[in-house]
């Protein structure tokens, strides 16, 4: 299976999981050039959540949780800023950055995976 197909499958799995947790999915693969994309954007009650999905089929060398680098965090923050510029109706919402880490068949939802100063 190609890397993109694997990523899409993991993101779909994450969306289904978040739906069971009562989150409303607003966007999937939001493109925020030149920074990249945000895997999932959702509402958790009155909080706007930007979610990165990481998948590892083999955890011998690293867990999915370990794959969210500082550089990726900065890209997510910049991408979130672009999303808010394009969607001013969410400007006054609290924002949060979460990680959905999928290791083999386990899903780990890390709320507030990193903070923004």
Curated annotation (Swiss-Prot):
Species the sequence originates in: Francisella tularensis subsp. tularensis (strain WY96-3418)
NCBIfam families (alphabetical): PRK12497.1-3 (NF009150), PRK14682.1 (NF011275), YraN family protein (TIGR00252)
Any one GO MF annotation of this record: nucleic acid binding
Stated family: Belongs to the UPF0102 family.
Protein's name according to its UniProt entry: UPF0102 protein FTW_1281
Cited InterPro entries: Restrct_endonuc-II-like (IPR011335), tRNA_endonuc-like_dom_sf (IPR011856), UPF0102_YraN-like (IPR003509)
Domain of life: Bacteria
């Amino acid at each position: 299976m190609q890397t993109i197909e694997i990523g899409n499958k993991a993101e779909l799995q994450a969306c289904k999981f978040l739906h069971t947790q009562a989150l409303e999915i607003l966007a999937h693969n939001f493109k925020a050039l030149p920074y990249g994309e945000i895997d999932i954007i959702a509402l958790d009650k009155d909080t706007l959540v930007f979610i990165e999905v990481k998948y590892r089929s083999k955890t011998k060398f690293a867990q999915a949780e370990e794959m969210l680098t500082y550089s990726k965090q900065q890209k997510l923050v910049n991408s979130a800023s672009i999303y808010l510029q394009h969607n001013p109706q969410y400007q006054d919402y609290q924002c949060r950055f979460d990680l959905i880490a999928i290791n083999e068949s386990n899903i780990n939802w890390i709320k507030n995976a990193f903070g923004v100063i």
